[in-house]
A protein has these predicted regions:
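Structural alpha/beta core scaffold segments of enzyme domains
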Residues: 1-266
Length: 266
């Protein structure tokens, strides 16, 4: 297999106590063949490396309207990422039942996705997996899709050992291996008149999707659809590129692409 980002799961270790498991995991030696990574948005754009096809919205004639405008502006803008920093890190408990089914206790915003992911991992029907969310110590989008792999690993260990298994990420590990708010690179050009009325815009949005798509399609679509904000754009080309990089996949975050789309027009 290929570990295509820092924090990619390679091996799971079980023990009777949390500290024992961490100590054992620290003794694992993995030999890697180094590949050339793509770490930033510019490299991914240059290589045309995306997690799914680009999204391009065009209406009117942006090229002609910008060229004919008495005034023009052109530039580049960056919008950084952000960690959710929920108080409770990702955690899951998997408990085998006497009838062969499995109970999962997960800190998740999306129990049905956890159910589907665990069932797929174990090769069992979804009705063999029951997911319960007793409480959740914060989420903000960070526990919409990300808890699935945590629960799947715990479930796999429980299935192998026949005993309850819990996987709890330390804060530093959680920040390394889970996705964040998508960071963006914007390249824009706009034409307007002396009163500030916009004639046309051409906006490129390069979004760091990470190593897999995750929820990037919806985030990028919302960023594109929020790019006009409160302004009337008679002619526009809005191009969104979900850049595939060797970094952990970014994910849902409050606003879900809307804030990134709005900041570029401002």
């Amino acid at each position: 297999g290929i570990a295509d980002c820092a924090g990619a799961p390679v091996v799971a270790v079980t023990a009777d106590a949390y500290d024992q498991a961490r100590a054992a995991a620290a003794k694992v030696v993995v030999e890697y063949e180094e590949l050339t990574p793509v770490l930033d948005i510019e490299d991914a754009l240059e290589r045309e490396q995306y997690t799914y096809p680009p999204q391009i919205m065009t209406y009117g004639d942006p090229d002609a309207s910008i060229a004919a405008a008495p005034r023009r502006i052109k530039g580049e803008l960056r919008c950084g990422g952000q960690d959710h920093f929920y108080l409770e890190s990702n955690i899951a408990l998997a408990v085998p039942r006497d009838d062969g089914d499995l109970d999962i206790y997960s800190s998740t915003q999306h129990p049905s996705e956890v159910q589907h992911g665990v069932a797929h991992t174990l090769g069992v029907p979804s009705n063999a997996v029951t997911v319960e969310v007793r409480r959740m110590g914060g989420g903000f989008g960070g526990k919409e899709s990300q808890p699935t792999i945590i629960a799947a690993i715990a479930a796999l260990m429980a299935d192998i050992t026949g005993r309850p298994a819990k996987l709890r990420l330390r804060r530093d590990d959680d920040m390394i291996v889970t996705g964040k708010r998508h960071d963006f690179l914007f390249r824009y050009e706009a034409g307007f008149d002396e009163t500030g009325r916009i004639a046309g815009v051409d906006i490129l949005m390069g979004m760091r999707s990470g190593n897999v798509a995750d929820l990037s399609p919806g985030v990028l679509a919302r960023a594109l659809c929020h790019a006009d904000n409160c302004y009337y754009l008679p002619n526009a080309r809005l191009s969104g590129y979900p850049c595939k990089t060797n970094t952990v996949s970014n994910t849902a975050f409050r606003g879900f692409g809307g804030p990134q789309g709005m900041i570029v027009i401002e």
